[in-house]
């Protein structure tokens, strides 16, 4: 979490869906490429659950469909990820366990302020993203339907299913079982809880067949245990526990129909999406299964479902894991931007 090559957009005090105020809110973001005179080459990339603007760089390049030589790419960090306003960096009264509940709606309201006020952009050519980033693309398209021309969510959903919610409760419980967690009021990181969080999460990130066929060896792990230790270390070394839980709650409450605009009428929210849409689920994704996207695709007017078959599961989209997925992703981008 030490990549300082980014910009800050000051939002001031933000009233949240919950009614609480997020004080002195800020978004951390990074741009790539140049905004053209027509301002019609904008591609927005939100961040995924353990993502950052830096990790989003794996989804574009000069030889990729999203190309900084052609597009003005805005990579925006999720509230709670340690770069944008988060429990770890909030004002003292909202630091740590005192951080308010954040929804997807809140995130996209803030991102809209950045895009419109900082860059005076009125149209976004494409919003794309993996996992929670894809969830944000749906939210953008429902919240600001006249502004978003195309979305490409992959391994994501417009509403978190009950099964997905239960999965998240499991990793949450593993973290919070550490006595050092202390209801979020810890002086030192809850190491045991963070390790347990990573260890439990690893079982969901990949499919059963991924382990059965020992695909983890392609990642350089000789054994399952070595993979699990790596997941432990990643969460201990890179993530604040309160930050993880803030984003987890945002994920659990993901529903594009939250708020006064739709009053939890999910189908109406889907029907109101005007953006040209391609959804790419993975056949073996354990928490964003294709069935959820099949339902969504029935109600989004201009939508195509392109299910990708891979035993990598949810992590098929992690840059570098599956070259075939990268090819499918770039084709979808080109089809949406043609």
Locate each region found by the language model:
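Acidic catalytic loop of the alpha/beta-hydrolase fold
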Residues: 251-255, 283-288
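Catalytic active-site module of serine/aspartate enzymes centered on a nucleophile-bearing elbow/loop
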Residues: 294-298, 302-338
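Gly/Pro-rich cap/lid or specificity-loop segments adjacent to the active site
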Residues: 22, 50-135, 142, 146-168, ...
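Short beta-strand/loop motif that positions the catalytic acidic residue
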Residues: 273, 279-281
């Amino acid at each position: 979490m030490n990549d300082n090559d980014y910009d800050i957009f000051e939002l001031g005090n933000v009233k949240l869906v919950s009614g609480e105020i997020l004080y002195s809110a800020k978004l951390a973001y990074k741009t790539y490429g140049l905004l053209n005179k027509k301002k019609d080459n904008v591609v927005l990339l939100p961040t995924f659950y353990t993502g950052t603007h830096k990790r989003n760089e794996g989804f574009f390049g000069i030889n990729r469909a999203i190309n900084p030589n052609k597009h003005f790419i805005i990579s925006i960090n999720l509230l709670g990820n340690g770069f944008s306003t988060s429990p770890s960096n909030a004002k003292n009264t909202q630091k740590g366990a005192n951080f308010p509940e954040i929804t997807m709606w809140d995130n996209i309201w803030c991102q809209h302020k950045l895009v419109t006020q900082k860059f005076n952009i009125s149209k976004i050519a494409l919003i794309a993203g993996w996992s929670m980033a894809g969830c944000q693309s749906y939210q953008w398209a429902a919240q600001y339907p006249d502004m978003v021309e195309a979305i490409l969510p992959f391994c994501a959903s417009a509403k978190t299913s009950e099964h997905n919610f239960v999965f998240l409760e499991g990793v949450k419980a593993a973290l919070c079982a550490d006595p050092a967690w202390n209801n979020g009021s810890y002086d030192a990181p809850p190491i045991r809880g963070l390790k347990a969080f990573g260890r439990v999460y690893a079982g969901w990130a990949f499919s059963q067949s991924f382990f059965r066929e020992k695909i983890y060896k392609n990642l350089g792990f000789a054994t399952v245990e070595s993979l699990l230790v790596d997941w432990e270390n990643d969460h201990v070394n890179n993530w604040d526990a309160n930050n993880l839980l803030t984003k987890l709650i945002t994920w659990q409450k993901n529903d594009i129909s939250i708020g006064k605009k739709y009053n939890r009428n999910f189908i109406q929210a889907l029907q109101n999406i005007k953006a040209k849409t391609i959804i790419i689920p993975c056949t073996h994704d354990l928490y964003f299964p294709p069935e959820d996207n099949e339902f969504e695709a029935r109600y989004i007017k201009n939508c195509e479902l392109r299910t990708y078959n891979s035993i990598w599961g949810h992590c098929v989209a992690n840059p570098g894991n599956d070259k075939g997925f990268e090819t499918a992703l770039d084709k979808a981008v080109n089809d949406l931007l043609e």
